C-alpha cells in the first residue's frame, strides 16, 4: 500500500481515541458532572497565596487566559503555568468584594508546582460512608453529644455561621478557649423509609468542644531567618525583610519558636521591640524595629515548605531540626540528647493497643526524614496533633557524624510562663463544595464536550512540554495504580464524573500514542514520513535498532511509574 494509506491506517487508532474522548465528554455533560468551584478554602503558611494575603472565601475569576475557572483548572494552571515569571490570578475578595489581579509564583520544593491553596469546604461535616466527621483522639471526637455525619454548623458561640470562612475565623480567634458549636441535623427515625420528595425534619444540637493542646518533648530549636512575609501585615509595615532574624522580643530572648506566637498574642495591639539581625551581602547589622502584633484572622496550614507561623506579625521563620536547648525535667532531658544534635528523622510508635487500628494514622511503620518531606514546625504543629494516648516518637539523632535512636513520650507544650499552647484545629472534617453542572441542551453538551476534549488534549501536550523544559518533575506522572485510584474517586461522584475522567484518559492515550517513539504509532509515522521524503523505506537494521531502543525506553518508563505508584520511588 502507498505511504498515505499506511499513514491513514496508523492514524486511525489516535483518531478513534479523540472521538471516544469527545463522545464520553458529551455524554458526561448530558448526564451532569460535579465541579469544585475555584474558591480558596485555606492557604499554606509560606506559600505564594499566603504571602499575597489570599483568604478563605476568595473567588478566582480568571487564571491566565482562562475565565470562570474550576478548581481543577487552578491545579493544572499552576502545574503547567509560567514558573519563572509567575501566573496571573484575578481574585474577588470575600472580605469586601473587591476585584484585583495578582501574580503568584508557584513553589516547587515538593516536586510539583504549588501556590499553597486548599479547595473550598461546606459548613457541613463529611457524610461519606465509612468516613467519620471527626478525627480520632481529637477534642471534636471526645465532645458530648457526638458530632454526626452530615451535621451542618449553624452557630459557634454567639456567631451565626454562613460559610466556611466564618468557621475558620472563629476557630482562629478562640484557639485557646472551649467553643460551643450548634449544629443542624436531620432527624432519622428508625424503620422510616427515606423520602427525597419531602423536606427532611431537622433539629439543632449544641456541642461543647475543648481546645487542642500542642505537644512537646522538651526540645527547643533555634528560630531561623524570616522566609515569608504576608502583604499588608504588621511585619511588612515595619519594614521587616526576608532573611532577617529575630534575636529578642522586648529585650528578652526569643526562646522556643513554637511558643513565640502564643506569647505575641498576649501583646495584641501593643507595640513591641524586636532586635533584628539583618544581612546584606557579606555584612551583618543589628537594628531595632517597633511593631504591633495584630489578631490572626484565620487558621494556619503548616506544610514542609512552611516555617513556624508567627501569624500576629504576618511572617514565617525557618526552624531547622537542630537542638538548641533541652528543657529540664522534660522527657528529652532524661535521655541521650544534647544541644547541637541534629534530628534526622522521626517515627511514630503507637501503643500496643492501637498498632492494628486502621483509623490510627500514627501506626505508620516508616521513619519520616526531615527535609523536603517534613519540617520541624509541620511535625510539631500538625503531625503531633490527634495521636493516640501514650504514643511515643522514635528520633534518629545525628551527633559528630554518628547516629543513634532515642524514643520519647510527649507532654503538653507550655510557654516560658507555664501557659498551655493550643492549636486552632479541633479535628472537624468538612465536606468539600461540589456544584452540579448539566448541559441545558444537546447542543450545549456538544459544545462542552468539545471544549473538554480540547482542554484534555492540550493538557497532555503542555505537561509533556513542561517536563521537557524541566519545570515539572518526571515524578509527577502516574501509572496504573494511580489511574485506578483516581477513577475510583471519580466514580464515587457519579457516572458523569467518571466519563470526564475517561475523557482525560483517552486524550492521554491519543497524544502519548502519537509521540515519535518506536513501537508507538508516532514512531511508525516517523518512519513513513522518512519513506515518503526519501522515496524508499529506512533500512531494516535501522528500524530494528530504533525498535529495540523504543522497547527499552517504554519498559523503563513502565517500571518507573509503577515504582512511583507503589511508593518505591519518592515523588518529592
How does the language model describe each region?
Residues 1-47, 68, 124-125, 133-134, ...:
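Internal alpha-helical transmembrane segments
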Residues 24, 28-33, 469-470, 492, ...:
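Short helix-capping/hinge motifs at transmembrane helix termini and TM-loop junctions
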Residues 55-62, 148-155, 241-248, 338-345:
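Short, well-structured beta-strand-loop connectors
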Residues 1-5, 112-152, 160, 180, ...:
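Functional transmembrane alpha-helices
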Residues 515-525:
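Transmembrane helix boundary and interhelical junction motifs in multipass membrane proteins
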Amino acid at each position: 500500500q502507498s505511504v498515505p494509506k499506511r499513514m491513514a491506517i496508523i492514524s486511525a487508532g489516535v483518531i478513534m481515541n479523540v472521538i471516544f474522548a469527545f463522545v464520553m465528554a458529551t455524554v458526561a455533560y448530558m448526564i451532569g458532572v460535579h465541579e469544585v468551584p475555584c474558591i480558596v478554602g485555606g492557604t499554606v503558611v509560606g506559600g505564594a497565596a499566603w504571602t499575597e494575603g489570599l483568604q478563605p472565601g476568595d473567588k478566582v475569576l480568571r487564571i491566565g487566559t482562562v475565565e470562570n475557572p474550576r478548581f481543577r483548572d487552578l491545579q493544572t494552571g499552576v502545574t503547567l503555568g509560567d514558573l519563572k515569571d509567575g501566573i496571573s490570578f484575578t481574585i474577588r475578595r470575600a472580605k469586601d468584594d473587591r476585584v484585583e489581579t495578582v501574580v503568584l509564583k508557584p513553589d516547587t520544593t515538593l516536586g510539583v508546582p504549588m501556590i499553597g491553596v486548599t479547595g473550598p469546604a461546606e459548613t457541613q461535616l463529611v457524610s461519606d460512608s465509612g468516613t467519620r466527621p471527626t478525627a480520632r483522639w481529637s477534642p471534636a471526637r471526645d465532645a458530648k453529644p457526638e458530632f454526626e455525619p452530615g451535621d451542618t454548623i449553624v452557630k459557634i458561640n454567639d456567631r451565626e455561621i454562613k460559610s466556611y470562612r466564618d468557621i475558620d475565623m472563629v476557630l482562629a480567634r478562640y484557639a485557646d478557649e472551649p467553643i460551643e458549636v450548634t449544629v443542624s441535623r436531620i432527624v432519622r427515625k428508625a424503620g422510616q423509609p427515606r423520602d427525597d420528595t419531602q423536606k427532611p425534619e431537622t433539629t439543632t444540637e449544641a456541642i461543647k468542644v475543648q481546645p487542642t493542646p500542642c505537644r512537646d518533648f522538651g526540645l527547643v530549636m533555634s528560630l531561623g531567618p524570616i522566609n515569608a512575609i504576608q502583604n499588608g501585615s504588621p511585619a511588612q509595615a515595619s519594614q521587616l525583610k526576608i532573611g532577617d532574624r529575630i534575636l529578642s522580643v522586648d529585650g528578652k530572648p526569643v526562646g522556643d519558636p513554637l511558643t513565640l506566637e502564643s506569647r505575641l498574642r498576649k501583646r495584641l495591639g501593643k507595640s513591641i521591640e524586636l532586635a533584628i539581625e539583618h544581612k546584606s551581602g557579606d555584612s551583618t547589622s543589628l537594628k531595632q524595629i517597633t511593631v504591633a502584633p495584630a489578631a490572626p484572622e484565620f487558621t494556619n496550614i503548616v506544610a514542609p515548605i512552611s516555617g513556624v507561623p508567627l501569624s500576629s506579625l504576618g511572617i514565617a521563620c525557618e526552624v531547622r531540626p537542630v537542638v538548641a536547648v533541652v528543657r529540664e525535667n522534660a522527657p528529652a532531658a532524661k535521655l541521650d540528647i544534647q544541644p547541637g544534635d541534629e534530628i534526622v528523622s522521626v517515627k511514630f510508635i503507637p501503643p500496643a493497643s492501637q498498632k492494628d487500628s486502621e483509623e490510627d494514622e500514627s501506626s505508620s511503620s516508616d521513619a519520616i526524614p526531615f527535609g523536603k518531606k517534613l519540617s520541624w514546625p509541620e511535625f510539631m504543629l500538625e503531625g503531633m496533633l490527634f495521636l493516640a494516648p501514650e504514643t511515643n516518637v522514635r528520633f534518629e539523632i545525628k551527633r559528630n557524624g554518628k547516629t543513634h535512636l532515642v524514643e520519647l513520650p510527649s507532654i503538653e507544650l507550655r510557654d516560658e510562663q507555664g501557659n498551655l499552647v493550643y492549636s486552632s484545629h479541633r479535628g472537624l472534617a468538612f465536606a468539600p463544595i461540589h456544584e452540579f453542572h448539566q448541559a441545558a441542551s444537546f447542543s450545549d453538551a456538544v459544545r462542552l464536550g468539545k471544549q473538554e476534549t480540547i482542554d484534555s488534549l492540550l493538557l497532555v501536550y503542555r505537561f509533556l512540554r513542561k517536563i521537557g523544559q524541566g519545570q515539572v518533575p518526571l515524578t509527577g506522572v502516574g501509572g496504573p495504580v494511580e489511574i485506578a485510584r483516581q477513577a475510583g474517586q471519580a466514580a464515587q461522584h457519579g457516572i458523569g464524573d467518571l466519563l470526564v475522567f475517561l475523557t482525560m484518559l483517552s486524550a492521554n492515550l491519543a497524544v502519548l500514542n502519537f509521540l515519535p517513539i518506536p513501537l508507538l504509532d508516532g514512531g511508525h509515522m516517523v518512519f513513513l514520513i522518512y519513506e515518503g521524503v526519501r522515496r524508499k523505506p529506512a533500512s531494516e537494521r535501522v528500524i530494528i535498532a530504533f525498535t529495540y531502543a523504543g522497547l527499552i525506553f517504554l519498559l523503563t518508563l513502565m517500571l518507573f511509574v509503577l515504582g512511583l505508584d507503589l511508593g518505591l520511588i519518592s515523588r518529592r
